Amino acid sequence: MKTNFLIPGSQLDRMINYSDAEKIERRALGLPACEPAPGGLIKQLPKGRKVVSKKAITEPKVLNEAAEYGAAFVRGLRVDLPGGITQLLLSGTASVGPNGETLYPGDFRAQLWRTYHNLTGLLASEGATWHDIVRTTCYIRDIERDYGEFNSIRNEFFHALGLDPFPASTGIQARICRSDLLVEIEALAILVR
């Protein structure tokens, strides 16, 4: 049996239709089985344990916030660790403009350059550069067709930046969140402050 609920709000203004199996799993997570969970319901931090300092990374001059078009993630997350270590975890970033629109549909090369532009802006918003990047994960819609171009542009960009060594990297063929996006890159930067 399914139960329907309307969740008001800008991101969740839709009907929720919970199946019996969902209800079982929701209960196991401490959520109400048949109704939307209120924010902050689950508190799982053990007594006496500190929370790692986290902050969303934004750069509205370069690209908009994902939540503006209903996505449930942030563009990046800054995590401050003990000992003055900061990690910047940049979410999958693509050729998206400041208003959330896809830029350069059908042009793989231009989309890749814009993706690097967006990532550079996110890094700069936290005082970081590509020299702080230690790992990238690169999602390419058609890896057989576009990987040669991808590798050529990446090599040119990283050489122009003087990166030595290059970051660790993995290339994966993937269906990206929008059909007109051809490439998306996640990145991890580590800074010592």
Spell out what each predicted region is.
Residues M1-H117, G121-V134, I140-R193:
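N-terminal presequence-like segments and the immediate start of the first folded domain
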